[in-house]
């Protein structure tokens, strides 16, 4: 997927440097300075520029087929957003949302925009390869994206009231065919909308369009004066010209576009925020911050005195008061002498000792110019920077510009170009901070000094247009980073009232390490446990480059604190085991394996503790039997004897010390040792105290023999270790009279895995212990008892579909512990990429739930494929070359397939397109197996899950 940006010319030259992005990730260009192209012509220009840059010798249509592309139009003069005009609207710094985790402390509008557009393009049919969007809006959605239909043009829209719609393009859809465009209107009046409402739905255009190659070529032909790729591009508007020519009954018919098919999609749960002007930047930020009012979901616990005050990368001596409203301070130093009121935007102000009192509506921007100079640009909160200086309607500093000039003895000739305020040379350049303070007072005071007018005339001056060209963006970004370095330790110190521990801590740790910033100290025991965990892992990440030993110690502390949180509840409730069997009785427990279909990983702490998890999985029997079995029987000698049938191993446990050795990974009997501890046979877990294990077993009435059978190869991906642990706990619960139900057994399995230090989530044990096909869900918090919702299993059992479900053992194995540790570390650090992927997985589980409820086999298969793609995106090791080779062999015959569990090997679950395709797969893989041990295993939905019985 390629990202193409249309930016202001000055930004193009240094974009990759100032954003720390790779040229391979973003292609940047700007529209020609000498002429306007419109959104349609600009799209053609951007595509052609990228084509010339990448493969100039290749035919344009062939080049178009190579990749999916996001085109973001982010050029323009930004007249009404002076604070960020030099760097472009898309690089506007946006404050971290107080209710969100994983955002970067220095995130920009571009960082927020891209994930949704990337998700849309990923979900689009292969024929839709080009997405066009605007750079001055932030669009978010609270619901999963719906399926995107095949069409030449697919447009997203939002429902809005008629007044809102009168300021936008509007898609009109016949009520009898609501998914198709009938025609498009630009800014229709409320009266016109009222007339059409009887027969049509009206959906506001949000400027996100997906185009097929056919539609792109049609747009290119309309944009070029001659043939595509030759001659100049004309002005052509994507929305008012191209858009209005589309539909069944277009408002502006065009024969050349009549054959294009169009689909309109409401963006369900969609929200639309403008960042194109100063007032919009502030109002949108306020609206976003206040989206979540439920205090349980607001991470930042401090209460701001004024919700419309935003400070970023700024050193501020005077704390904002209740009287400060609509204030934005960024990349600035405001000492004791600075006093703000309302509607003040302050950006780029270097360290100073000025005495400044800004009236309402007065804003200050300082722009680095050259190597040492600064351009001072005061302006008004609502200034449009449009119109002739002689026009009374043209305002500057929220007053008629003529009035402002008259007070200062400034004449039109001083400005050089007075036909347009944007081109007027108003803003002086100096490297003298004392001069700059005098000039600032001269710009904004009611009684400006004549002497300063002389100073103003004597200095080189730039217009707003000039500043977009002359700004030294590398200096600007360097200053921003220096300001940030001063504020980050303060954020960390004031963590209780700041966003520090909710941001992307991997990114934050990099900033601390690169700039040798003082790390925050260990948090005290009275701090929230999850915050202490974040603190330890943050310190580990920041120390990784300079002190590996200390880094590993901090990481171990984070995992230890996590274990403490999960096991605390189990330790509070002590067990009292007592013998409930006859001397010759055997307790026999057996469980199914599980295949996770969607949402795997969202059950893993700490993600599930922070967000709750959604997982859809199935319990399966293999080759006609439950594959995981445990036998427990009394022993006449007061010791514990563990046996494994499949491993051919045995161990005799006679002391508490031997029982404690459960956390050694690789030990064949770690699970029964930990299970016995949880059942009350280790001090700290039992209700009564004994001096030795032998004494406790004598009091219990017998020794214990535990025999394990796992009829599944190691590293299968079917949840073997977790389900075996649950099966042992189920057997011991019955044998020792503990009375645990299936839910308690699954919860204690989560605790057991933390004791083993293997980590892991809860879906494996719930998947095998609970029967059938189910959606499993938990809510945020350390109590991770899952709620199960069962679905029909007919898709897996009816004769025409049962053969389509194939389970194939690949013979390739991979241990999950190291995979888990890496991804869990990303969860601890609020890694932006990890959290975004996990959020998608969680929503995807609900799509899978719906498909199973609807018994939609075709959709189910495609959703299994999407699950596999999500797993690969989260962990590249999920799909090693040998597995990818297998995927290539079966792909044409499958709707979807995936490796259950963490991936990398084990079993492959396949959903064949039909029984004939399933037969072809069996023939192919039986004739040419992937490895010597590779084989098909018969799978059947388990109707019982965990069963426990006695002889």
Q: Where are the language model's segments positioned?
A:
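Short beta-strand segments
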Residues: 71-74, 131-134, 156-159, 212, ...
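Short helix/loop capping segments that flank catalytic or ligand/cofactor-binding pockets
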Residues: 80-82, 141-142, 164-166, 192-195, ...
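C-terminal nucleotide
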Residues: 441, 445-698, 746-759, 765-899, ...
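N-terminal glycine-rich phosphate-binding loop and ensuing alpha1 helix
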Residues: 1-129, 133, 138-146, 404-405
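DPxDG-like acidic metal-binding loop motif
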Residues: 87, 716-738, 909
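Left-handed beta-helix
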Residues: 2-7, 34-58, 137-138, 153-154, ...
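Conserved core of the sugar-phosphate nucleotidyltransferase
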Residues: 64-66, 85-88, 92-228
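Stable alpha-helical structural segments in soluble proteins, enriched in small hydrophobic residues
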Residues: 46, 113, 557-558, 562-565, ...
